[in-house]
Structures are given as structure tokens and as C-alpha cells.
Amino acid sequence: MRFDIVTLFPDCFTSVLSSGLLGKALAKQIAQVNLVNPRDFTTDKHRKVDDEPYGGGVGMLMKPEPIFSAVESLPILERREVILMSPQGQTIDQPLLRELVSNYEQLVVICGHYEGVDDRVLHLVTREVSLGDFILTGGEIPAMALINGVVRLLPGTVAKTESLTAESFEEGLLDYPQYTRPANFRGWKVPDVLLSGNHAAISQWRYEQQIKRTSDRRPDLLEKWQQEKKPGSREQGSREQGEK
């Protein structure tokens, strides 16, 4: 997977791209990240990338010319998506990440800044994506989240592939509570069922905890899951857990 990140602040990505699973994935060439600064494509001596909006208004907008030039300088792979990070876009979720991994080999990610971008930039864009219903100073942090979410789904990034399918949101529910040693910490004890060695009972407990936690914290997800779940999914999961 190739990522081309169009950003006025490429240095923001340095530590993120060199650490953790993301850094390892890049080192193993599972993914490639190319940082492109639209300021490098300006033609005036001040390297101006923003200007006042027509009709008046607060703040400055990113000009279209440097963004177009930056994107048009990039190679075009056969399966390419051009994404604008925007609060008006589709919210990042696990189905979106899986779709991007399955369908594309190149993601061009444009990070807006100031009060946004000239609307004509949308002629370049095939999709707008948002981190959530709130405003940030720029698209860099949402872009980092998008890259991280996509890369960890690429084959070879996570050593144990079952770790991916057992996480929150992958089955439509939040994850169950998890514990490690010690079994008793300041009076808070690990549930007995997890110490029992009974895999079927553990699987059932985890399933029940997923339902409870999702109901308590994200009832909207539980409602969606109840509408979409397939008959037999729990029983199949229980059998798989019991066979391990």
C-alpha cells in the first residue's frame, strides 16, 4: 500500500511513522509513505499557499493551485483513491478501513489547514473522510489515524492475525474486559471464569461482556449489530474458542 500525504507540515509525521507497528511495517515495506508539501509547488517568492475567501469571512483558505500541482506530480497507480481529510466527510470506522485495504493500492491523502481548502479542490477528490464531528486545526492528526488504521490491517503488520478479528468493532461489538497478572491487584480480582481453564465458559463470558459493555457504552452500536448479525454467529465463535 502506498500513501501520498499532501501536507503543509510533513515534520508532524516523523515520529508517528518511525515508531511502533507503523514504523515496523514501513521498515518491512508492507507500506510506503511519501510526504508532499504543497508549498514546494508555489510559484511566488513568498511561497504563499493560502488566501482570503471571496465574499468575505473569517480566516484563510488553502489555494487550489499548490494542491493540484502537488497531487498531479504523483504517480497514478491503477487502484487509487484521493482522500480529503474534512469534518464534512465520512467518519472513519472499521468497515471504511477494511474497504480501503481491500480495494486500493494507493491512497492520496490531502490535509487541509486554516479554514479549509478552496472548494475546487474537490474536483481532485474521490472521497472526503473525517475523524469525527469536531474541528481540529488541520487534517494531519486525522490523516495519521487513517494511515495507522489501514496499515495495521495490511497482511504482515500484525503478527497474529486473530488479534485483528478479535478486536472491538471487528464483530460489531466493543471488546470484552481483559486482564493480566497479578490475579489480585489492590483487591480487584480477575473474574474466576478466566482462571478456570474452561474455554467454552470463557467464550460465553466474553460474549456476554461484549453485549453488556456495548449496551452500556455504545447502545447505537448494539442496535446496529442486532439488526445486522447473522444467526449462529455466537455458536460458531464459541465452538472455535473451545477447540483452541
UniProtKB/Swiss-Prot annotation:
Record-level Gene Ontology MF annotations: tRNA (guanine(37)-N1)-methyltransferase activity
CDD domains linked to this entry: TrmD-like
Domain of life, per lineage: Bacteria
GO cellular component: cytosol
Residues bound to S-adenosyl-L-methionine: G112, L131, G132, D133, F134, I135, L136
Coiled coil: none
Subunit structure: Homodimer.
Role, per record: Specifically methylates guanosine-37 in various tRNAs.
Family assignment from sequence similarity: Belongs to the RNA methyltransferase TrmD family.
Name of the protein described by the UniProt record: tRNA (guanine-N(1)-)-methyltransferase
Highest classification ranks of the organism: Bacteria, Bacillati, Cyanobacteriota, Cyanophyceae, Nostocales
